[in-house]
UniProtKB/Swiss-Prot annotation:
Ubiquitinated by the SCF(Slimb) ubiquitin ligase complex; leading to its degradation by the proteasome during interphase and regulating centriole number and ensuring the block to centriole reduplication. This is Serine/threonine-protein kinase PLK4. Residues 371-381 have a biased composition (Polar residues). Belongs to the protein kinase superfamily. Ser/Thr protein kinase family. CDC5/Polo subfamily. GO terms for molecular function: ATP binding; protein serine kinase activity; protein serine/threonine kinase activity. Residues 669-748 form the POLO box domain. It comes from Drosophila pseudoobscura pseudoobscura. The gene is SAK. The active site is at residue 139. Its EC number is 2.7.11.21. It is found in: Cytoplasm, Cytoskeleton, Microtubule organizing center, Centrosome, Centriole. Serine/threonine-protein kinase that plays a central role in centriole duplication. Able to trigger procentriole formation on the surface of the mother centriole cylinder, using mother centriole as a platform, leading to the recruitment of centriole biogenesis proteins such as sas-6. When overexpressed, it is able to induce centrosome amplification through the simultaneous generation of multiple procentrioles adjoining each parental centriole during S phase. One of its GO terms (cellular component) is centriole.
Amino acid sequence: MMSTRTFGETIEEYEVQHLLGKGGFASVYKARCLHSHQDVAIKMIDKKLIQGTGLTSRVRQEVEIHSRLKHPSVLQLYTFFQDVNYVYLVLELAHNGELQRYMKQHLLRPFTESEGATILRQVVAGLLYLHSHNIMHRDISLSNLLLSKEMHIKIADFGLATQLKRPDERHMTMCGTPNYISPEVVSRLSHGLPADVWSVGCMLYTLLVGRPPFETEGVESTLNKVVMSEFMMPSHLSFEAQDLIHKLLKKSPHERITLEQVLRHPFLKRTVGGSSYSTTPGALNEFSQSLASSDSGIVTFASSDSRKSHRLRSVDNSSGQSMPQIMEEYLPSSNLGYDSKEHRPVYEQHGSYLPTPGDQLENRDAKWPGTNNLAPFTSDSDMIPSPVGEKRLLMPPLETKRLQPTRYKTKNAIMSILRTGEVVLEFVKFKVKYNEDRITDICRISEDGRRIIIYQPDPGRGLPIREHPPDPLIPSENCVYNYENLPNKHWKKYVYAARFVGLVKSKTPKITFFSSLGKCQLMETMTDFEVRFYSGAKLLKSSTDGVKVFNSNGAVLSDNGCAEARNLIDHGNECFSHCVNISNALELAQTKENTCFPVTIGRRPAADMHAGQRFDGLRDTTNFAYSTPKSNQGSINFSVSTISTTRSASDYNSNTPRLNMLAAHQNVPIKRITVPEIGIVTELSHGVVQVQFYDGSMVSVIPKVQGGGITYTQANGLSTHFGNNDDLPFAVRDRINQMPQLQMKLKCAPLLGNARSVDCHLMTPKTTTPFYNRMII
């Protein structure tokens, strides 16, 4: 930085020229220093206005931060001073003005990818400098990127910037420009440096497309789109550009690409070539140099786009305290030491670090769980005191990572996990006026469990029940909460959702391991575990039911101390520890972009496999060994106080001779057709009709002679059996509605080549080992 003595310390030492921009609290003028004869921009901030509106701390904070900065990509603050009426900031003059105005009024087109990459590189270099000093800008937008006389990018407007005590510190302030603000900031969640990364993604999209990714006619609708992270990617952009934008605009801040990774991304490698910062204008040389402007600060420049670039200012939840007089805080810049704690902004003391979901999942105990994690949370012991004495939920935020989309209906609610990972609860009440159940309350929870939206759709009437949740809606900002400030009247809804997610996790395999004795599956809960032994025995471990051991005949071994049960339990303990160790190792190996789960380790020993099950690892994946599907998961019964699983009892008539013959023979396909846009329909020799849908799910219709009912297998392998009188979930009902049409097509299909031999076998029964319910892929 040039010495402050080069610049005047009073306004009389400057020749103030024409107005560059004007806002509610400040005006920016072009000026010339009478000492150095250098052109500068002077921001004149009205002290009466900022003191009357509580912005004194904002100005003090801006000066505290900006005065320490020196980087080619950051607009320089030369000096500052004050008189009775104004605070003056003497700034570097950016001759070519705002990048947004330049693109709209002079370039008259979006930037090319080469030009966009040059701009991106300079912005990222400047942000890396800021982040290295734990400074979060919080308002990166094209309006706050200025162009110097040499067409270099200058990051300006530090009115919303904040100094963090450490890189992982989080803040709760709602601020920024709507088109560039991140989802966690809109949702009033704790946020940190990744919020600037999101803004960089919006910036890059705007440079290459010509408009922001979430732009709408109104601020509220824009913020709704931001929260849902919904935007259209133009097809004309290169693969590298699309990939980088997608990585920058990840909804979860923990999944976003880092600024260091941006510099190594193929988009910059391809279009710029090299990773070092360069001050050469490069692709910007063709730009004309016809605008004059300066740091906008708190100024909002008047333009035709002012409606769309309206900024959200000062919605800080911690700004209720009285601020010291500004005169006491404006010290010479030489006294503003970077590490000087006494000169840090006052608001820092109110920042709070909130642990991420990953922090709360560390150090899991690799032992059998001994407590019920799904116990009701209804007493005072279910809450813990916060630092200010208010009570909070004891349970950690829910998380739906890797859970497949699903939808379940209970008496009072419909619960869904969407493809985005969002959890939706639709609470149902019977409306006499409509003579039907209607959706009266909706609770939407983000995949990390930290953003909650609760509202009443169409109050007084409700919505009719549909096959899928209602479209996302945020009626007002009062409907949006975060995990830390959720009112206690909504805690039961959150607990209800968390139990639903917990139950789905308890049925979703994370690690599948084939040991020497059986197939082991560690579920996403990291506590639920099962072993299906090749002998037919089974061991189940859950946080609700403890350990259950079944012998090869399916009977429960009530005495876990007997030799048979002890051997099975010992092997289960050994495999459980092994699976937990595998999980911990893979957790360290995976990256934000690439997950290692779910994973399958090993395969069933060939000596224990039925001859019909052996296969070459390179065989066609459609060459299955089929059997009559059976249920391995009961229908789900929820209540606010308890969650349990119940099995539908089906009466199997095992006395008929034909059923004995069927049980003695392998269940093989006799007909198979492929239906476009649906999947593969197969009829098995035992009479079962299976439909393998292209989304990975499967429906099996079982004939009455074998007990009847339907088995639905989700894409993740989770199977549920439904009796003839059971209430079917929407996903199953939708698929079952297609069955009559598919069965008609199947009737017209010719028999497969092995069908005749199957019929001959059925004429002459033989004693063979029953083929267990197993599918080899």
